[in-house]
């Protein structure tokens, strides 16, 4: 089955448990349609570059899935209809990266930048 990565932004007025409940809910939608949620990360509340639906901040979540296209389309459709979800980005990948995403790594664990001139 194809592999996908999703980033979801939920409203800022949700609690952390409600935001993580959204991840579980959409994982259940995938499994009902023949897919699976391989891994997920809750990135927390972050400030956005511009307002979306009068919100300056949002709960960010990252999902790695292994699902057929029809399951992903159904999950995206339900995400767009859900009142608490403001934005969704889905990308098809060849393989999932090992370990935590770049957002979850500590700054000293990341590759260092080149030297300044």
From Swiss-Prot:
Gene3D superfamilies: 3.30.70.60. Keywords: Ribonucleoprotein, Ribosomal protein, RNA-binding, rRNA-binding. One of its GO terms (cellular component) is cytosolic small ribosomal subunit. Pfam families: Ribosomal_S6. Residues 96-117 are annotated as: Disordered. Signal peptide: none annotated. The keyword RNA-binding applies. GO terms for molecular function: small ribosomal subunit rRNA binding; structural constituent of ribosome. One of its GO terms (biological process) is translation. InterPro entries: Ribosomal_bS6, Ribosomal_bS6_sf, Ribosomal_S6_plastid/chlpt, Transl_elong_EF1B/ribsomal_bS6. The keyword RNA-binding applies. Residues 105-117 have a biased composition (Basic and acidic residues). HAMAP family: Ribosomal_bS6. PANTHER family: MITOCHONDRIAL 28S RIBOSOMAL PROTEIN S6 (PTHR21011), SMALL RIBOSOMAL SUBUNIT PROTEIN BS6M (PTHR21011:SF1). Belongs to the bacterial ribosomal protein bS6 family. Binds together with bS18 to 16S ribosomal RNA. This is Small ribosomal subunit protein bS6. The gene is rpsF.
